[in-house]
Design a protein with these regions (language model features):
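Rossmann-like NAD(P)(H) cofactor-binding subdomain of soluble oxidoreductases
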Residues: 65-131
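Short beta-strand element of Class I
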Residues: 3-6, 118
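Short connector loops/turns at beta-strand edges and beta->alpha or beta->beta junctions
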Residues: 1, 55-59, 254-258
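Conserved N-terminal Rossmann-fold NAD(P) cofactor-binding segment
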Residues: 8-48, 283-287
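C-terminal substrate-binding/catalytic lobe of Rossmann-fold NAD(P)-dependent dehydrogenases
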Residues: 110-117, 126-289
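Rossmann-like NAD(P)-binding element
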Residues: 31-91
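Structural beta-sheet core signal
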Residues: 7, 52, 93-95
Length: 289
């Protein structure tokens, strides 16, 4: 996707290891050979896209709540944004670090970074997990499922079930159309989506493949100017009448970053879940302001 990749890490030895490991894959790639090297924050001045993965992550056996990372990673994010904004305010920043929505909000608001250029991976991977799980239940390809996980990348995320469909077949017709023995258990499925990433951490120590491809999906949409609609974390500016937080909404992603956000019509259950999510994230932000 990119012809030049610069790795920045306070541990230069580790950065060099990442560069060496990644550079060996270029022999297999049927694309332009990328120049992969170790760099510094000064390299940000020429960057089109900056991907932030810095800070500690959830560890096996510890809390399953990403908010335990809050205090440490807020400081890490502030340090990184101070460095980045010294050299650029025009690069698209993709935040991968947790707690996702809090860090995305702080990075945009405290540094007055252009809203459309600061994107969190948010519920993009949660949505992929949901589509895969629902597709398996119905016996179809996950790419035929249209459905979004919205809100927080965490415990208050929710699914607007009224907007879920498979090739136009509405969710309430799934049992009949796909020959299911019983209706889809919405609460159970959403719970499985929420905990699956944490389950992977317990099993292998970390998550990697899913989030890596999620980042690639965003980078690809930007580099190819796709105007793809994907769920991503963005600071709200009046969507659903809300502001003062970042959370995931369907976003149109292009070379300009977030071209626009879309608002899925919500039923009463969706509106209730949106309010719960908003109030939770707002309380967390106020606790660190």
């Amino acid at each position: 996707l990119a012809d030049e990749i610069v790795v920045i890490n306070r541990n230069e030895k580790k950065a060099l290891g990442v560069v060496l490991d990644a550079s060996h894959t270029t022999a297999f790639a049927y694309s332009a050979n990328a120049n992969i090297r170790v760099g510094t924050y000064e390299d940000c001045k020429d960057a089109q896209i900056i991907i932030n993965t810095a800070g500690p992550s959830i560890q096996p056996g510890n809390s399953r709540d990403r908010m335990v990372l809050l205090q440490t990673n807020v400081q890490v994010m502030k340090e990184i944004m101070t460095q980045i904004t010294t050299y650029t305010r025009s690069a698209i920043i993709i935040n991968v670090s947790n707690p996702m929505d809090i860090l995305t909000y702080i990075a945009q608001k405290e540094f007055n970074y252009p809203r459309n250029l600061l994107i969190g991976t948010g519920t993009l991977l949660d949505t992929a997990r949901f589509n895969k799980m629902l597709a398996d239940l119905c016996g179809v390809d996950a790419k035929n499922v249209t459905g979004f996980v919205l809100g927080e990348h965490g415990g208050t995320s929710f699914i607007p079930w009224n907007a879920v469909n498979i090739v136009g077949i509405p969710f309430h017709d799934f049992q009949k159309q796909f020959g299911l023995k019983e209706p889809v258990d919405c609460e159970k499925l959403l719970h499985e989506v929420k905990v699956s990433g944490l389950d992977i951490v317990e099993l292998k120590g970390y998550t990697s493949s899913g989030i890596a491809l999620s980042v690639c999906r965003l980078v690809g949409a930007i580099m190819r100017n796709e105007r793809a609609v994907v769920p991503a974390s963005v600071v709200l500016e009046g969507e659903y009448g809300l502001e003062g937080i970042a959370m995931s909404l369907p976003c149109v992603i292009s070379r300009n970053g977030v071209e626009r956000t879309l608002q899925i019509p919500l039923d009463k259950e969706g509106e209730k879940n949106l309010k719960i999510c908003y109030e939770y994230l707002r309380n967390v932000i106020e606790s660190i302001s």
